[in-house]
């Protein structure tokens, strides 16, 4: 008996919609990364993108535990000398709430071309509406 290996053209990809209201950021991101990778499927193959598309709604209502709301700091660099920037979790939620979930999930995916392909299947929206109705996403309760 030969070991099964998924072929990229034969992978069945479904669309799911997740409501992030009141969900803990890390626990939500872990499950999203797992499903983007395809590890929940029997035909999971490490070197093939077998994951599903995931739409996350209400990113602004994601929860964090403890004092992370005021203490957690996100850093990025502009590329110029002395151009390091920082923002707290509260500031990120106020300015670009989608980025909080995107950053958390991206850090849990593989680094490299395959990880970037998996990351592109994540669609995050701050509000309660999305423009992927044509894909008929199924509600996923995490």
Swiss-Prot record:
| A cellular-component GO term for this protein | cytosolic large ribosomal subunit
Q: Which family does it belong to?
A: Belongs to the universal ribosomal protein uL13 family.
Task: Give the species.
Answer: Erwinia tasmaniensis (strain DSM 17950 / CFBP 7177 / CIP 109463 / NCPPB 4357 / Et1/99)
Q: Does the keyword Ribosomal protein apply?
A: yes
- Does the keyword section mention Ribosomal protein? yes
Official protein name in the record: Large ribosomal subunit protein uL13
Q: Name one Pfam family in it.
A: Ribosomal_L13
- Family annotation (NCBIfam families): rplM_bact (TIGR01066)
- InterPro entries from the UniProt entry: Ribosomal_uL13 (IPR005822), Ribosomal_uL13_bac-type (IPR005823), Ribosomal_uL13_CS (IPR023563), Ribosomal_uL13_sf (IPR036899)
Q: What's the subunit arrangement here? A: Part of the 50S ribosomal subunit.
Gene Ontology MF annotations: mRNA binding; structural constituent of ribosome
């Amino acid at each position: 008996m030969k070991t099964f290996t998924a072929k990229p053209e034969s992978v069945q990809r479904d669309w799911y919609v997740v409501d992030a209201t009141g969900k803990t950021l890390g626990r939500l991101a872990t499950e999203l990364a797992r499903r983007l990778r395809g590890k929940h499927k029997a035909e999971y193959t490490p070197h093939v993108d077998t994951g599903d598309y995931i739409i996350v709604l209400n990113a602004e209502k994601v929860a964090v535990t403890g004092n992370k709301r005021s203490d957690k700091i996100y850093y990025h660099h502009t590329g110029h000398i002395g151009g390091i920037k920082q923002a707290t979790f509260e500031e990120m939620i106020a300015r670009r709430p989608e980025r909080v979930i995107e950053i958390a999930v991206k850090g849990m995916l593989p680094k490299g071309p395959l990880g970037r392909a998996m990351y592109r299947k994540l669609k995050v929206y701050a509000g309660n509406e999305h423009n992927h109705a044509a894909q008929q996403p199924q509600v996923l309760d995490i």
